[in-house]
Amino acid sequence: MVVSKQEAISFSVTSLGWVGAIVSCVLPVWRVTFPDDETDPDATIWEGLWHICQVRENRWIQCTLYDTRILVAQDIKVSRVFMVICTIGTWLGLLLCVLGDWRINCFMNFTIEENLLKVAGGMFLSVGLLMLVPLSWVTHNIIHGFFNPLLGFSKKVQMGSSLSLAWTSSLLLLLGGILLCVNIPVCRDFPRCIETPSARPSGANNDTLDV
């Protein structure tokens, strides 16, 4: 299997972005609400895509799944769908990238392998852009609420580490897609493309004619 340096970097960067997207999707730290002195002064609230957790000062954490009794924000519901689509789409892009690298050899149809890498790069770019939609929505709501003068400090929500990780993952996916799209190898870059089984020495035909 022939893999260029740019392809290896793109694959590594995109793999990191994919792992980061999965981790951010699982960990329930998208939004953090600090303790309210009037209700529960010891508990910090973590909100994720699937869980909501109470974290107390003694580091005791209690997490529960969202159910009908807990009102789930609309931006969180949409983020669930987008993040699942993005993680699956990135996995498919990585699979195409591996297949494209594995099948690049000059005794096969090089155009097919080149197209596989183009599709993989396009998928990485699309997934990275698609991930920005829920991230921007959630971040906008957090910032808007944080600077709302009608809310006290204890009611204000801040960005969690999972949301920051999701932003980083989205940028890594975009970077990996760009690197792959602009550095797709062409057949002439590989020595085996020149040396095909049908190649003959230049003097072979002359010897035949002399006989």
Swiss-Prot record:
Function description: Plays a major role in tight junction-specific obliteration of the intercellular space, through calcium-independent cell-adhesion activity.
Protein name, per record: Claudin-13
InterPro entries in the record: Claudin, Claudin_CS, PMP22/EMP/MP20/Claudin
Family label: Belongs to the claudin family.
Annotated membrane topology: Multi-pass membrane protein
Disulfide bond residue pairs: none
Originating gene: Cldn13
Entry keyword Transmembrane helix: yes
Pfam family name, one: PMP22_Claudin
Extracellular side: 30-80, 140-165
